C-alpha cells in the first residue's frame, strides 16, 4: 500500500483515477449521454494504463522481460476480449472483426513504431532480442495466412457465408490456438535461453513487491475492462458527434483505447532502454490477438452468439494486417533500432488511419 501511495504522489497523471468512479456514476445517472461517457471513459483508462505500466515493469524486473511482456500482453488483451465479447453477444460481428484487425495493426505499427521513436529520441541506437522478435513475427505471419484463406475463398463464392466457410474457420481456429500454445512452450520452456533479455540499467524507481505488483495487475485490468465496456457502448454515437466513420471507430479508436494499458508499458520500457520489453509487448500482443483471441471468439460464438462467426475479413482489413505484419518483420529483423525507423513505421499507420477516416460509409 505504501508503494501505491508513493506512486500516486510521484505521478500526477494518476490523479485522473477520480474519473474511474465518475464513469460509472455518469452511466447510472444519464446512460444516454454518449459523448460525455465517451470522454469520461477515455480519461479513466489513461491513469489505469499508467498504473498497469508500473506494475508490469515490477513483474518484469523479477521474472525477465520475456515473461513480463507475455504477462502484460495477456492482461492487456483482456480489454480487447471484453470489448469483442460484448459485441459478439449482440451479433455485431463486423465490430468484432474490426476490433481484431485494428488491434493487430495498432500493435504492430503504432505501438512498435512509437516505441522505436520514443526510445530512439533518448538513446542513440537501441538493441533488442531479434530471435524473440522473429518468432513473434513468424507466428503473426502464419496467423495472417489463416485470416487470408477464408477471405480468398469467400471472394470466389456468392451469397451468404457457406457452411464450408464456417467449418474452415472452426478448424483454423483450433489450429491457431494449438500453434499459439506450442509457441509459448517453445519460448518459455524448451528454448527459454534463446529469448533471455539483454541486461539494462535499472530504472530510477525500485520495483514493487511481486505480490503487490501481481494484485495491481489483476485489479487494474478488471477496471480497464469494465470502463472499456462503457466506452464501447458510447463510442458509436459519440463518433457521429466527432465526425468519425464506423470503420475508423472500430479499426482505430477502439484499438487505441483497448490497448492503452499495453502502450503505456511499451513506451515506458523504450524510454528506459528496455526495448526487449517494448518489442515483446507489441509483437506478443499482436500475435496473441491473431492466434488466440480471434479463434477463441470464433469458438465462443457457437455458445453465446446468435449465429457462428467465421474468420472471413473484408479485403481491405486483410491487406492492412498483412502489410503491418511484413513491416514489423522487416524492422525487427536486425535487432537494432533508431528513432527514424519508428517514424517510418508510424507513417504506414497514419496512411491506414487517414484512409479509414476518409472512407465513405458505403465502401466499408
Locate predicted features.
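Hydrophobic alpha-helical segments, chiefly the membrane-spanning helices
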Residues: 1-364
